[in-house]
Amino acid sequence: MSEAPRFFVGPEDTEINPGNYRHFFHHADEDDEEEDDSPPERQIVVGICSMAKKSKSKPMKEILERISLFKYITVVVFEEEVILNEPVENWPLCDCLISFHSKGFPLDKAVAYAKLRNPFVINDLNMQYLIQDRREVYSILQAEGILLPRYAILNRDPNNPKECNLIEGEDHVEVNGEVFQKPFVEKPVSAEDHNVYIYYPTSAGGGSQRLFRKIGSRSSVYSPESNVRKTGSYIYEEFMPTDGTDVKVYTVGPDYAHAEARKSPALDGKVERDSEGKEVRYPVILNAREKLIAWKVCLAFKQTVCGFDLLRANGQSYVCDVNGFSFVKNSMKYYDDCAKILGNIVMRELAPQFHIPWSIPLEAEDIPIVPTTSGTMMELRCVIAVIRHGDRTPKQKMKMEVRHQKFFDLFEKCDGYKSGKLKLKKPKQLQEVLDIARQLLMELGQNNDSEIEENKPKLEQLKTVLEMYGHFSGINRKVQLTYLPHGCPKTSSEEEDSRREEPSLLLVLKWGGELTPAGRVQAEELGRAFRCMYPGGQGDYAGFPGCGLLRLHSTYRHDLKIYASDEGRVQMTAAAFAKGLLALEGELTPILVQMVKSANMNGLLDSDSDSLSSCQQRVKARLHEILQKDRDFTAEDYEKLTPSGSISLIKSMHLIKNPVKTCDKVYSLIQSLTSQIRHRMEDPKSSDIQLYHSETLELMLRRWSKLEKDFKTKNGRYDISKIPDIYDCIKYDVQHNGSLKLENTMELYRLSKALADIVIPQEYGITKAEKLEIAKGYCTPLVRKIRSDLQRTQDDDTVNKLHPVYSRGVLSPERHVRTRLYFTSESHVHSLLSILRYGALCNESKDEQWKRAMDYLNVVNELNYMTQIVIMLYEDPNKDLSSEERFHVELHFSPGAKGCEEDKNLPSGYGYRPASRENEGRRPFKIDNDDEPHTSKRDEVDRAVILFKPMVSEPIHIHRKSPLPRSRKTATNDEESPLSVSSPEGTGTWLHYTSGVGTGRRRRRSGEQITSSPVSPKSLAFTSSIFGSWQQVVSENANYLRTPRTLVEQKQNPTVGSHCAGLFSTSVLGGSSSAPNLQDYARTHRKKLTSSGCIDDATRGSAVKRFSISFARHPTNGFELYSMVPSICPLETLHNALSLKQVDEFLASIASPSSDVPRKTAEISSTALRSSPIMRKKVSLNTYTPAKILPTPPATLKSTKASSKPATSGPSSAVVPNTSSRKKNITSKTETHEHKKNTGKKK
């Protein structure tokens, strides 16, 4: 018996070699084989009764293979021949029946079989008759209170089709007295008839769109026919405006639904297909109402596995079709989930009858209880992040005064006179501006109008920029027009002719500032890393870090909203981040359309406010005045410029010494740069060279020439406002166009950065009061929104308030994690940080932790791309509801991407860490910064190999310390230092990451004694799974020293690796009290952490592939770490012991219109800070940069393929190596980590 396969496909089984399926069934051990006389265990037989096209489809096979992994389940597929031709008495026997109708299926026979054998039926058979009639479907939906488009039914007698209640007009039809204006939809009443027609109004050209079942690349065709069909019965319904997408929802039981959107077939009838020929499906998040709809549809139609179509329109969700039994295509995660849920439903129902020892499995990730960084066992309730956009091309703008009547006409046409301002971004609007520019330039050839002539170079530039990409997209260009009643005042840099008093328009053209490919990678990587802040990941999916979030997400327990300002780079950053966060695939555009909300409607993330301009103008004037003095900075200048005592500012001022002399140097370096570019352009070898992001040398020259011209004005003074643009441009060229090897670029970078480090932060205020006033001007709407996000967590989900009967299982509010992500530009990030720093959230003189956080922020000199401010809210369910201790808020921060210099002086915080009270068990230590990978030069051996050393080789030492600044050079044994993880070989980076984030389930309350009880294996499943994955990376790379070998995903972009390790600060997580005895645990349970008990090799392989981390061999020196994507500074904890009440009162004080600038802010003496030895030293951060991927030699490619083949599509519960012990492990694991709620309901 042990030799026979347990997954049958009818009589063809004889042709199957059981060996091919060996890993799907339980093999008896040799000892068991000797005891043949013991009775075999009773198997539950699951019968699959459907047409062969369905039962042998890829999704069905994938799911059945996984169901077969249940130890007590055997799957039998009924042959089509038997179904169609044999009486039901001859059909195979089964205990559970999965049967569903499709074209040609004898549903009557299936019903008779179910009556005869009385198996447990997964999808009710009688209801499948009703699903075939759209009228019945609509009737059931209506009875359930589910929204439908407005509809009417036209029933025709086939023998007398003319007698019916239909009146047809030119642009409407009237059915049974109900009028439908075009566009409307006409559907046959039979659900099997897919010929749905949509009729268009004459104003839009009339005609109709005829939809049909997909044929090749078409799903509909336009027809000039405008009259409705005259034979047959139809449902007429209102056409819903859905932005061209339909949402398909697939349930597996009432508590699980997978949703995806596809391009609506009504749009143009062309099926969008990806490179592999599959229809493009977009990711979708169901909202609370839609989750409830899925729940209702599943139960109302009694179909456990059920697909239905949703239309999202007018802020509502309407069901327009219920398809019955259907599976998601091409989603390995769905296959895993579906098989797991179905297997559990079967076991729960039938195991007791057959006396099979099976208990209701509890899902390890059921309630998101996670270790907070302050050492308490709490439930994560809310994550709020404000994030700056990723790496972008330099922003460019050109101003010109225009007086031509055509511009005034356009201004009037677009209602510009209402506000005196106009922003043109839409393709049609930009086309009109381009047409005017072309026309004026043409006129210039015919007559010499002086006003037009004056603007000729600018008109040409306007035309060039608007023609630049061959198409318009609001993402990369915009034109602003401002009405000037008395014309434009002439500046010193322009011609000093007499000023004209007539009205004119100021035209400002903005372009550039697009997200670069590097920026997309940064955002996607950060999204991937963000997953790791979420709970879970202990179950079958523990093949890669952060899987807990994906799990939360697909089981309705993640309430995610992503907001972005209206700038293209910000929206694309948000989409790329979402792609990484939710493990999505494909292009960013569909993700953007489906997932990113534009927040510009209420000024949430855009800054068009005029209230801040007066204060900012005063600040800018003072700043310019100080920086125009041709002398070394005096003590008075230091006092004027750095009243807040910012270390980074003082450092920049020391470097600059004399601002005018530094500007002279910068100017001469720009002149040198432009002459070098001109020289290159004359060189025939490099004249047509392609620079990064398709820029040409000519465009690069134009960019720098404009800066050269604008930086130094006619009177010899420097325009300080151009410094950020100069820094922007040189940073871009150093980072992306380094291959040009232009001279002195690093010197220009260093000087312009020093100037920008003063100008940029100080433009947002010099004194604390100014910083706060300006910050409020930008951020008040956002602060209000953050406050409401934190407050709403305490309320039940709206659905639960409306429908208490449904307040159970996955809909219960305490199981939700709310995530709100706000993507914005530099101004909002600076402003929000100013509010946190200077708004009196905490008192530095009384709160040691806050003082250290402020000291750290004083050293941060730039809020670079991908800067993050993260607020996390936790709930302790054991505390009284009214207690201040019930809700706990943490504040984290990262200054974003690292700079271009190999900067050893990166500011270092105190880690993503446990609270300062957890000092018991501290050990003396010594920090050895030489092991930090980013300090290694290109010619050194890469230390990442040492860093990711296998956990098995050595016991891991966790050093517990209290968080104080780290010194780069020395740290004496008795010096207080941050909690950190280190080992003799420096295994720290990954240990911090695994033991602290989403690892342990239980954490002690801050201040309690650390107990010595060992951590349960379950609590360390996540840790071990990551260690498992990384062990494989390391072992692969250990081989690398002998054989050049890489795990390369075929589709991976070969220039960009990816990483996640360094995105949480490495200083402390390993000391996490969720695993106080990890060191002993690792010593005793080494095997468990890395062998079969955790995850198998194939799954590990897939985890590695998901993380696209690979090492590339340096031709001469072993290893090289290289990437054009700058790595991102780790997230550092600013405070981890805030109460929700404290944060709420603080946000309320900032958001209230009358709030004065708080005076409570503890002042820091700038002199004291300057003299502080701790703050003068800056320490390096331990961050791993992705390696460059080299092609894999053919010999090793085969072995890599072989090792990773079973798991190519991600960690799957079906991937089991061919060993009996592994089989047992997987089975028991499947039974211990099942989805609780899917087993808690009777069908």
UniProtKB/Swiss-Prot annotation:
Pfam families: His_Phos_2 (PF00328), PPIP5K2_N (PF18086). Its main location: cytoplasm. Residues 958-969 have a biased composition (Basic residues). Residues 898-941, 957-1016, 1185-1243 are annotated as: Disordered. One of its GO terms (molecular function) is ATP binding. It is linked to Deafness, autosomal recessive, 100: A form of non-syndromic, sensorineural deafness characterized by prelingual hearing impairment. Sensorineural deafness results from damage to the neural receptors of the inner ear, the nerve pathways to the brain, or the area of the brain that receives sound information. This is Inositol hexakisphosphate and diphosphoinositol-pentakisphosphate kinase 2. It comes from Homo sapiens. The gene is PPIP5K2.
